[in-house]
Every structure is written in structure tokens, then in C-alpha cells.
Amino acid sequence: MYGSFDQDAAPGRRRRRARAAALTAAVALSVLPGGPAVAGPRPAGPAPVVTRAGLDPSLVAGRGAAVDFVEQEAEHARTNGTVIGPDRSAYTLPSEASGRRAVRLTPGQYVEFTLPAAANAITVRYSIPDSPDGGGSTAPLDVTVGPGRGRTMTLTSQYAWLYNQYPFSNDPDAGLLHPDWWITECSCVPAATTPAPTINKPFRPHHFYDEQRLLLGGTHRAGEVVRLTSPPGSAAAWTVIDLLDSELVSPPHVAPHAVNAVALGADPSGRRDSADALDRAVSLARRTHRTVYLPPGTYQVNRHVIVDDVTIEGAGSWYTTLRGREVTLDTPAPDGSVHTGVGLYGRDPAVGGSSDVHLSGFAIEGDVRERIDTDQVNAIGGALNHSTIDGLYLHHTKVGMWFDGPMTDLRVTDTVIADQIADGLNFHTGVTESSISNSFIRNTGDDGLAMWSERTGNAHNTFDHNTVQSPVLANGIALYGGTDNTVSHNLVADPVREGSAIQVGSRFGAEAFTGHLWITDNTTVRAGTYELNWNIGLGAIWFYALDRSIDADIQVVGDAFLDNTYNAIMLVSDWPVKDQVAITGVAFRDIRVDGTGTSVVSARTAGSASFANIDARNVGAVGVNNCGSFHFTPAGSEFSLTDLGGNDGGWLAPWLLPNTITCNDRPAVVPPPAPAPW
């Protein structure tokens, strides 16, 4: 979603951050109900309510990505539709909405947003019904801005609406994919139960939302009204609008001295396949030590383009798009893929990977509608050493970026990843000295950002100043083993199920955590989800010992856990291994907890942790739920807490220390009030 790109990425990033800072200043006077009016002409519509992750931006200042767009939640806008939610229960439309609320329109109804700053582009996050066969439906959405001529967006559900058990199905009428798995709906294993339980269909509908971008054809001033209308006669019985992002996109970037891909046969109309032309452009650019330039347009690419020792620039992610179909292979590939599709890939790590690849200023639009884990249908993949990725928009692929090591020194910046079937980004197996920063990830079908040390450890990697919103499965940020990694200044909001905001897990065959792990100055919002399989609440941050113990130097410092559905912090081991593993030596310091449905800390494992300067308020149940390893001996819990002082709010009372058993996994949940300034 970024529009200005130079040969030197650093000046481009500086300009984007300057624009973001100016945008923040421009809207700061009008972001909250009751706030002072913006200077200038009187707005044509009601005062805009600008949010970040559905909150007053002041509550998350300094956390997350500094983006060029401004977020407005539909539930704060003017509408003659119906506000739905709040609801944090899985498999509901409100639970997957940003802020857990949205607006439902029937044909003829509208929702209006007042622009808080000048804009020439919008992004609409929406949901419409699926078709009866699960193949997807389309519906119009009329868009008008001020008195100008209206436009119509064609919404689709083709990339939304999954059903059933992992890895899910597009068929709403399908029977259980795994009848031999235990399910919470009947608290049974259906295949082993007599009489067989009744399974309602569609079973477990989820992944309801999609987003669509629109250039408005001109710049509209602050105060003009954007009206989104489900037109009379729409085939969609309802249209749910979650939010609108508005943005002032810079003019297209031009690179007159680069290798122009169009001159080598790439088709910006999208009618002809441009993959071979891109190969020619990459080859020429490497021979002549020049950059490949993709002018404005949509380029059809239906396979991977291999990149190595090359720079590829687009005109900006709003102007240059690589778009492809998912293509069924005649025979499975050696890696198990049965499909291919649009993607830029480094060489396989087995042959050393690629190096010195620099990608910036374009979008990749895939066509992935189902999850097949063996398929390599990701937007960016392979191994990229000493490389950079900046200012991309990645949409409708399986994973935005999946990197297989060994590889080192990759920098991902200022990138948007949205509407993925699985992860947003995964550093997998031996990725070192790499980072993603100032990037925005929304509506992933698995972990938003992950470091997975499967077989070979990751080391010295950083996730910094990213925003992860509404992962519909798993976690916002997940860390599976590794050495000396850092997660800092991120904003994670609205995880839904089978995960939470931040996970530290010894699972999935990951190598051990060694050295240090720093989790510092992050904010989570509306996390601490309900774990359906365990029938308990998780923590906004949760530590999970399954494959092995967790005993590295782990420092959780300066974080804020806001509006937690259940717990703020959880340390847990799985029941079958509870007497073989432990979580020890985790240090929590300088943390604020504003609202828990249940506890500040829930310990369901052997081990220990220390706490210093943890301020907590609006705690729904006992401050510490300490079950340990569930042996309940007179010596107390197998988990010990150390009070290092400065813990305010009464949550860590002396009688709880060091290991008093207070085990109640399912206390009454007290919904906390909305977060407020401390």
C-alpha cells in the first residue's frame, strides 16, 4: 500500500515514515469521539473516528507499523445498517472482525465514513455470503465520495469461507474430514461413539472476510464522506463491512534507466502470460548490472519466477501487480506440490539459495482458495541471502512469505500481507540475521509472523514494529525454538482460536530455545483466547512446553496486554508430558495488564518465573491461577513465582507466593472494560 519507491530503499522508507508521521499529526485532533475539531473547513459528515487495531491510537503509540493509511471501524461510522457484535466466540462474523464488531448491510443500506485526511484510495474489509456449493459468490458495493460520480466494487467470497477440520474444505456440505479426531462439539470422537453424534452443517465455518482496494481516480479532501452502499437488488442477502482504510497514494515510481520488462514482452494488460518475459528481463538485468522495472499494469504470471542477484522494482503496489491463477500440475513436483501459481522464489537452499535480491514497489495477487500444505503457492519463497523486500502488497496466496534456510541477512520492510490461507511470514529452518519490520499483516489463516526452528535452529532474527490483526487461526506472532531472537514494538490484535497474540512454543519438532529470547515493548489487544480443544482460556502471551522443556534466558519486558478475553500470561504443558517437561526462568518486568476476563497469570506446568513492576487492573478472577503439574501435594504447586517487587494492583498477593495452589481453570469470566490511559 505504498506509492513512492526510489533506487535507494532507505530514502523511500524515510519518506514513507515522514508521510505516516504527517498523517498522524493531521488526524490527531479528530480521532476520538468528543475530540477537538480538525482545523479548516467544516467537514461534510460526522467527525471521523480513527483507530489503530480498533483502539484509540494513543493507547498503542510507538507500537506496530507506521503505515500510510488511516483505519476507521464501521461500527463507529454513520449507518442505517446493523452493528453486529461484540463477540469473541469462534466461527462467528463478529469474532473475526477488527475490534470484534462490524456493520451488517442489507440491500439498500449504507455505511458512511468521513475522511480524516486527504485520500485518493481506499481499502474495504468485508464479508458476503458464500454460495451454496462453497465455490463463492459475488455482489456489488456502490462507492461514492462527496458529490462525485460513484463507482462499483465487485465483492467476492471466493477467497473466504472455509469449513470443517484442518486443513479445511471449501465444501459447506462435507462430512467430517477426521471423524477419528476428538471434537469439542460433542466432547467425543465421532467415529468411536455410538450412537453417532449429529454434526451440524456447515461444520465450523470461518475465514469470513476479504479485502479489496480501490483507487478513487482523484484526491478527496478531509471531511468528504465515503458512502458504501449495498445496492437495492443485490444478490447478497447481506454485506458486512468491517472497516475502511483511506490513503493518499503517491504518483507512480518511474525508473527510466532500468530494464523495462514491457520492452521484453511483458504484457501490462494482463491478457498474455508474462512469466517468460520476466525471465528475459531478469537475465538481461543480471548481465548488464541494471534493475528490472515493471511499469504500471497487471501482469499475468502463473508460475514461479526464480530470482537471484537482481533488483526488481514496480511503480508502487497500487500500480504494478503480478497476478496469477492457481495451476494444477500434470504430476506432483518433487517437493509434493500439486499446484503452482504466481510467486517470486529464491533458489532452493540445497543449492545455496539466492543472494542479493531486492524487490520493491509491486503487488502479488494470487488465486489460492484451499489449503494444501505441500503446495508451494506462496507469494515469495525459497532462500534469499543478503536481500531486501520493501513496499510489497501480498494478497490471496497460501503464505505471504515462506523462507526455507539455511539463509541469512534478509530484511523485509514496509510490506502489507493480507487474506492468506496460512501464515503471513515464516522464517523456517536455519534462518539467521533476518528481520521483518514496519509491516502490516491482516487476516491470516495461520500464524501471522513465525520463526520455526524445525531441524535447524533460527538465530539472531527480529520481528520489530509490525502490526498483526485478526489471525483467524493460531497466533499473531509465534516462536518455535531458536537462539538469540527478538520480538519488539509489535501490535497484535484479535486472534480467534487455537492460538493467541504471542506464543513461545517447544512444538512442531522445533529445536530448543537457547541463548536469549527478548519479547519487549509489544502491545496485544483482545487476546487471551478460548482454547476449544482444552476447554480453557489461554494467555495473550503463552508459553507451551510440548516436545521439550523451555529453559532459555527469556525476558518479557515493557509489554502491554490490553482487554484480555481470559488471561494475560499463560505457561502450560500438555497433559501427557506434564511430568517430563517444565518452563523455567522466564522473567517478566515493567508490564501493564489492563483487563483480564480471568487471571493475570495462569500456570499449568512445572517450572518458575519472576515478576517485577507488573501493574494490573480490572482483573476478573484471582490474580494467579496456579495448577502446576496437577499433583496437588502438600508442598504446593510445581510452579513457583518470585516477586521481585513493584507489582501493583493486588494481583500478586503474598499468600500466593511462592507456589500456593489456586487451580481453577474455568472460573466465571468477567468481561473487562475497554482499555483506557493508565
Predicted regions, residues:
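Acidic Gly/Asp/Thr-rich repetitive segments characteristic of extracellular carbohydrate-active
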Residues: 261-293
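Extracytoplasmic
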Residues: 45-256
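Right-handed parallel beta-helix
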Residues: 318, 355-366, 385-398, 407-422, ...
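Leucine-rich solenoid repeat scaffolds
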Residues: 603-666
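Extracellular beta-strand-rich solenoid/capping regions of secreted or surface-exposed proteins
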Residues: 279, 283-284, 299-313, 321-360, ...
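Short glycine/acidic-rich loop motifs that flank beta-strands on beta-rich extracellular proteins
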Residues: 290, 301-304, 317, 321-327, ...
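Extracellular beta-strand solenoid repeats
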Residues: 283, 293, 300, 306, ...
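Secretory targeting and sorting signals
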Residues: 1-44
